[in-house]
Amino acid sequence: MASQPNSSAKKKEEKGKNIQVVVRCRPFNLAERKASAHSIVECDPVRKEVSVRTGGLADKSSRKTYTFDMVFGASTKQIDVYRSVVCPILDEVIMGYNCTIFAYGQTGTGKTFTMEGERSPNEEYTWEEDPLAGIIPRTLHQIFEKLTDNGTEFSVKVSLLEIYNEELFDLLNPSSDVSERLQMFDDPRNKRGVIIKGLEEITVHNKDEVYQILEKGAAKRTTAATLMNAYSSRSHSVFSVTIHMKETTIDGEELVKIGKLNLVDLAGSENIGRSGAVDKRAREAGNINQSLLTLGRVITALVERTPHVPYRESKLTRILQDSLGGRTRTSIIATISPASLNLEETLSTLEYAHRAKNILNKPEVNQKLTKKALIKEYTEEIERLKRDLAAAREKNGVYISEENFRVMSGKLTVQEEQIVELIEKIGAVEEELNRVTELFMDNKNELDQCKSDLQNKTQELETTQKHLQETKLQLVKEEYITSALESTEEKLHDAASKLLNTVEETTKDVSGLHSKLDRKKAVDQHNAEAQDIFGKNLNSLFNNMEELIKDGSSKQKAMLEVHKTLFGNLLSSSVSALDTITTVALGSLTSIPENVSTHVSQIFNMILKEQSLAAESKTVLQELINVLKTDLLSSLEMILSPTVVSILKINSQLKHIFKTSLTVADKIEDQKKELDGFLSILCNNLHELQENTICSLVESQKQCGNLTEDLKTIKQTHSQELCKLMNLWTERFCALEEKCENIQKPLSSVQENIQQKSKDIVNKMTFHSQKFCADSDGFSQELRNFNQEGTKLVEESVKHSDKLNGNLEKISQETEQRCESLNTRTVYFSEQWVSSLNEREQELHNLLEVVSQCCEASSSDITEKSDGRKAAHEKQHNIFLDQMTIDEDKLIAQNLELNETIKIGLTKLNCFLEQDLKLDIPTGTTPQRKSYLYPSTLVRTEPREHLLDQLKRKQPELLMMLNCSENNKEETIPDVDVEEAVLGQYTEEPLSQEPSVDAGVDCSSIGGVPFFQHKKSHGKDKENRGINTLERSKVEETTEHLVTKSRLPLRAQINL
């Protein structure tokens, strides 16, 4: 029984695989809606059924239902069709199979849309992302994606063939001649394959090249507009993809695996009357319908398994010969229209598709070629081409006219086709003859075997009846002995049960004793192991601890010695450094007073020079005032004589003089502002000097440079006006510059000692600046007052020109008074300047004294600080020494503590060894000694002879039993009849009941049974006789097998 599934699977593989048939229904188009057509097709994708209503709208009961491998309704998308139909086939192509997918159906039902698809409006998607893309672009996209992801080395070649009016054209031909026809020949390597001479195979490297090839081929394909479809395909197209993949075996040998995929877009069948095709279009429609009709006849012949299949009646069927009934995996996509206008065409398409489901193909993997075999094949092809080329160049062959060559080649092709057809017919007849002879011989042998088996069975039945009577007598004896054995068995069972109970008690007691021994042994073993391990670990731990203590104490002693030496060196170096600092500081402090005194003497000399200059300026001003006075008197005397006109001129001149005096006053005021700014800058610089005493000498030099530049800029701005007055100021500024330059040199050494005095200098400078500003304000105010009085005088002179002579003396007196007042004020100003210079001299004396005091104080501070620093270092050294002694004490204490811990650990060890070990404590479960009660003797059955003697003594009872058995004879004899009936049923039933054999059993392995089984349905007597003999032989084989099985228990019973 276990071998039956394997044999059935093997038969199924030998039988082949059915072609996959898929039905796709398109939605309504605009023309069908305008014609008010109604839907007659219902698609059920779940149950895979298509139902067609054939009785119109009113009659809903009359319908035809077809079942297919897959069904897609009107709402199905392109991607759904691709994933369901093409993806599994594509995997088989990569595995090395040849596969074919072609669309079949009426024109305008969506075959080209399913195979090629369309581009979305405005081309907003790429080829691979376009939802309207068909099977061909999606397939090529996935081929490149899968092969690239697998990482295998591969090459892809494509070709595009067109069958138009039963002529072959290459749509990928690079030449401009589109009408060049191709020739088709049989493939010598594949009996069912064909070779198309001159067909261009283009190697593609990526998806973009494939899309360009598809566009190029679609542009060359013949299409035209009909009433059924605006872009009706007028030809069949075959798009072939050949994939060469390289594989490496375990031994390192390189193999080439070849897979081929044919994507066929058939032209649709059409009704010329409905499509409106005339002239050329009508001839095209006739050729299309003729090729599709041949395809239908081929499908019918393959389904009915006729000996001759008309592949050669059309070039389309000849190309698809291997796909229909060959070694190719084939899928058909049947497209239909849901409209009632196309009812006849829809039913025809569904009938063809449903019939094609029964076609059996035997897909085989293409033979994998080794690298050497492939190179050898290419080399032979190259040599053949070289020979042809050499013959053509040397002109050694036979040359005939082109017309004769065409006639001869046509005859050869016709003869070759006839020869192939005759060979196929002869092969079919010979195969049929061989099958019939084999069936006849098998049936004859089976009949002879059945006769011999029947004779053997009759003899066995006779001997069995003889043995039956003997067996009955033996049965009575055995029953009596069996009853005696049963009673003995009961007694033995009771004794055995008692013994078993006793054994159970003893085993429990023994197990308790053993468990006690195990506990004791476990405790002893645990204590021994724990004691041993603990002792070893503790000894190693203490040894390590002692070594660590010794190493730590030695390292700490060495560290303390290093600390002592380091701190001694540090103390000596710090004392020497302090000594050098003290000597340098004292030397610098002794040099500071000398430098200050020299600079102060220079400043005194400058002040004396300024005093002399002030005296000279005083005399010069007095002389100028006198000259001004004399000039004024002479001018007044000269003015008295002219007329009123000259007075007006003088009035204008006075106005001009007053304007100039205003400008002079403004300039003096500006000078005062600039001087205020200069003094404020100087004060700020002094404040910065006070705050930034730690800054370097470079910054102080930069500040002095800025001060010099400011003085130079002030001197340049005021050099053009008030020449005499500015000469004094320039000299004074030059003196200040020299003082600043002289003071700048010792600033680097004195700047730390004059921090306190700088505040006083700033205050004094601010006081003098305020005083100078007040004096300048008074001078400018007087000039302004003078200006106002002059203006009033001019106005009065203008108004009172008639009274000029009377007031002339008064004017002269007022001028004299003003000159005197000016003289006095100038003298007062000079005296004030001299007094300010004296005050500065006094301040410099005070500054010198303060600097000397500061130097002395700083020197004393330095010596005190150095002494304090030395004392601090000595104190720190003593502290470190004390700390080291404390550390030594701590180390000693730590060693003592470690020794104490070691002692404690030893005490704990002793405690563990004495107290912590486990002891064997009694649990009270140990069994006590006791006595067991059990039977000491066993019952035995009496010997067979004694039992038979007892049976003879009971003869009357035996006779009664025999009488009872004779009365029951009627029951025992039918039992034998039943056995004979069963045996007869196995031998006779198959001969009388032929319908018990399943007509659907796969019998292909017994020589062409499916072919004749199919013939039986057509009522041919010869085939019926053959199948009847086959059935009888098979049934007799099974009968023999069953009889042998039923005989074995009977023989065993007889032997008993």
Swiss-Prot record:
Top-level taxon in the UniProt lineage: Eukaryota
InterPro entries: KIF11-like, KIF11-like_kin_motor_dom, Kinesin-assoc_MT-bd_dom, Kinesin_motor_CS, Kinesin_motor_dom, Kinesin_motor_dom_sf, P-loop_NTPase
Cell compartment(s), UniProt: Cytoplasm; Cytoplasm, Cytoskeleton, Spindle pole
GO cellular component: ciliary basal body; cytosol; intracellular membrane-bounded organelle; kinesin complex; membrane; microtubule; mitotic spindle; nucleus
Residue ranges occupied by any Kinesin motor domain in the UniProt entry: 18-359
Secretion signal span: none
A family per Pfam: Kinesin
Keywords: Acetylation, ATP-binding, Cell cycle, Cell division, Coiled coil, Cytoplasm, Cytoskeleton, Disease variant, Isopeptide bond, Microtubule, Mitosis, Motor protein, Nucleotide-binding, Phosphoprotein, Ubl conjugation
Sites of the Glycyl lysine isopeptide (Lys-Gly) (interchain with G-Cter in SUMO2) crosslink: 477
Binding-site list for ATP: 105-112
Modified residues (N6-acetyllysine): 146
Disease: Microcephaly with or without chorioretinopathy, lymphedema, or impaired intellectual development: An autosomal dominant disorder that involves an overlapping but variable spectrum of central nervous system and ocular developmental anomalies. Microcephaly ranges from mild to severe and is often associated with mild to moderate developmental delay and a characteristic facial phenotype with upslanting palpebral fissures, broad nose with rounded tip, long philtrum with thin upper lip, prominent chin, and prominent ears.
Name of the protein this chain belongs to: Kinesin-like protein KIF11
Organism from which the protein derives: Homo sapiens (Human)
Gene: KIF11
